[in-house]
Amino acid sequence: MTHSTSNNQWQADTYDHKLDFVSKMGGDVLSLLQPQPGERVLDIGCGTADLTAKIAAAGAVTVGIDLSPEMIARGSDKYPHLNLSAQNAYTYRAAQPFDAVFSNAALHWMKDAHAVAVTVASALRDGGRFVAEFGGYRNVAALVSATERTLTAHGYDPQGRNPWYFPTIGQYAAVLEEHGFLVTLAQHFERPTPLHGESGVRDWLDMMADDFFYDVSAEHKAAIYQAVEDQLRPEHYRQGQSIADYRRLRVCAVKQAD
């Protein structure tokens, strides 16, 4: 997904195979979009484009953007008919207005929410809609706390490593309203998310949390991964799978005329 401020390194094939729940769980927010035939829809942080393809299958004319060239290349391989490109969501400007802007599991990678809101507003026609879901307040709090504690125990300062923006409803609604949107729906909810198999936590840390480990030796990283697993196991492991403590923020908004 688009990560305009993160140094996270994306492995597109691994993402598709081991973190495929990201797009699979996007069905609910996609149903809120209700794309119509002929509509122009921009997908911000499209990743490997599974949801972009579903929007296009409804008859919409889609454009998908993501900061990661690896993700775009993987999406283009899977869906060569789609218009996908590597773009920064902070600076992207559309040549033609869109009827809708969509985003799933991406906006929490973009700490400058105001810059993203400017992009969304500039992309939409008046009356156009914005539908998004991403990490909300206290998303993956247990994973983050365990990681930060373990980094500290191994002599690493955890400050400044967290790459994510997890706002409350009020915080994010205020951003959208400041940029000319009328918020029509805002939900914050828990979504406990199973991670694949015995290596689920390690795979998640490898794919999602590079920023925490940019200066950590391979030896320390292996020990930290094991310690994080051990800390999470009592409360976040069921029936052979680790459970990530996801909390999501879902919003719908309409761009108001100036």
Q: Where in the sequence are the language-model features?
A:
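Conserved class I S-adenosyl-L-methionine
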Residues: 1-39, 50-54, 71-74, 78, 131-154
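Class I SAM-dependent methyltransferase SAM/SAH-binding core
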Residues: 42-44, 48-92
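A short acidic, Gly/Pro-enriched loop at the edge of an enzyme's catalytic core
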Residues: 90-101
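A short SAM/SAH-binding and catalytic strip from SAM-dependent methyltransferases
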Residues: 100-114
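A short glycine-rich, Lys/Arg-flanked "PGG" loop and its adjoining helix->strand segment in the class I
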Residues: 114-129
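Short alpha-helix
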Residues: 165-179
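C-terminal helical/coil "lid" or tail adjacent to the Rossmann-like core of SAM-dependent
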Residues: 184-239
